[in-house]
């Protein structure tokens, strides 16, 4: 029992380290609990700061599920204990003791925990998320669909009924955290993820300097994902007025120099009438 409690505590405490809040504070981004969807998770950070920060938070959140589960497996814990350790990590992410119990929705942490628990299950859940997000462009719908299927994937691939309850509890918690998204989906008010390419292409794209764009009610969205050709055209448009001014100045300077260099007239002065007389 002491071993079980130890792993549960480790999972919960690691899950309580909210990477979304830490990343936003480190890089000077708005507090994800107060801006955007007010959810301290990867999707909201992507909205607030761009793709590079969203992916960073997603990776850290996944590690919070991966590390405690790997630790439990290294300590030769039973599969059901490992599954409860994964549950503890997800609960820690949702209700972190270090951040006044205001956490995220646990999707990335759940996928990370499943990857460490059973790699194929984790891959299937992640693939489900990517496919749903790619076709319907709703992050919440992708999360609901993929996590809901996780317990049934485990039954098919593992066949151990003992691990079904903790995985099913994770599903219930994730669905509860998405209750507002579920209502907005029904009403047709849920914001879509908006990318220039498919979701898979955006995630696989190597350049970290390109920001993602997402629609959100009441928020102005600036598209920073501009092609290089467009950037070049904008730069040239800015430089053209400066070039014209420089040319005008050069012409004025040249005309002054030419005027200064012209020899003075050497024509003799005409004598007055009196001198002639």
From Swiss-Prot:
InterPro entries, A to Z: G3P_acylTferase_PlsY
GO cellular component: plasma membrane
Pfam name, any one: G3P_acyltransf
Catalyzed reaction equations: an acyl phosphate + sn-glycerol 3-phosphate = a 1-acyl-sn-glycero-3-phosphate + phosphate
Any one Gene Ontology molecular-function term assigned to this protein's record: acyl-phosphate glycerol-3-phosphate acyltransferase activity
Entry keyword set: Cell inner membrane, Cell membrane, Lipid biosynthesis, Lipid metabolism, Membrane, Phospholipid biosynthesis, Phospholipid metabolism, Transferase, Transmembrane, Transmembrane helix
Entry membrane topology: Multi-pass membrane protein
Bias kind Basic residues: ranges: 240-253, 262-271
Keyword hit for Cell inner membrane: yes
EC number of the protein: 2.3.1.275
Any GO BP annotation: phospholipid biosynthetic process
TM region(s), chain numbering: 3-23, 55-75, 79-99, 111-131, 155-175
SMART domains linked to this entry: G3P_acyltransf (SM01207)
Pathway: Lipid metabolism; phospholipid metabolism
Subcellular location: Cell inner membrane
Enzyme class, broadest EC rank: transferase
NCBIfam families: glycerol-3-phosphate 1-O-acyltransferase PlsY
Function recorded in the entry: Catalyzes the transfer of an acyl group from acyl-phosphate (acyl-PO(4)) to glycerol-3-phosphate (G3P) to form lysophosphatidic acid (LPA). This enzyme utilizes acyl-phosphate as fatty acyl donor, but not acyl-CoA or acyl-ACP.
HAMAP family: PlsY
Known partners and oligomeric status: Probably interacts with PlsX.
Protein name, as recorded: Glycerol-3-phosphate acyltransferase
Provenance organism: Legionella pneumophila (strain Lens)
Top-level taxonomy: Bacteria, Pseudomonadati, Pseudomonadota, Gammaproteobacteria, Legionellales
């Amino acid at each position: 029992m002491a071993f079980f409690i130890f792993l549960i505590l480790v999972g919960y405490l690691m899950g309580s380290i909210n990477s979304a809040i830490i990343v936003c504070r480190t890089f000077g981004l708005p507090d994800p609990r107060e801006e955007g969807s007010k959810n301290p998770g990867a999707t909201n950070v992507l909205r607030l700061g761009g793709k590079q920060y969203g992916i960073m938070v997603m990776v850290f959140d996944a590690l919070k599920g991966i590390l405690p589960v790997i630790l439990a497996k290294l300590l030769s814990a039973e599969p059901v204990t490992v599954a409860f350790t994964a549950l503890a990590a997800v609960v820690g992410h949702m209700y972190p003791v270090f951040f006044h119990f205001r956490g995220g929705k646990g999707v990335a942490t759940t996928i990370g925990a499943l990857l460490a628990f059973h790699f194929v299950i984790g891959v299937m859940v992640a693939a489900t998320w990517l496919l749903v997000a790619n076709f319907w462009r709703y992050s919440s719908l992708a999360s609901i669909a993929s996590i809901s299927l996780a317990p049934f994937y485990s039954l098919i691939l593992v066949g151990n009924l003992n691990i079904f309850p903790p995985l099913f509890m994770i599903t219930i918690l994730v669905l509860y955290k998405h209750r507002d998204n579920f209502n907005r989906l029904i009403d047709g008010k849920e914001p879509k993820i908006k990318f220039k390419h498919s979701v898979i292409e955006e995630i696989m794209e190597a350049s970290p300097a390109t920001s993602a764009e997402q629609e959100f009610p009441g928020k102005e969205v600036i598209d920073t994902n501009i092609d290089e050709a467009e950037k070049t055209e904008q730069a040239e448009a800015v430089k053209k007025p400066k070039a014209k001014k420089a040319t005008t100045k050069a012409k004025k300077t040249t005309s002054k120099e030419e005027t200064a260099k012209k020899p003075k007239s050497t024509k003799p002065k005409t004598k007055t009438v009196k001198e002639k007389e």
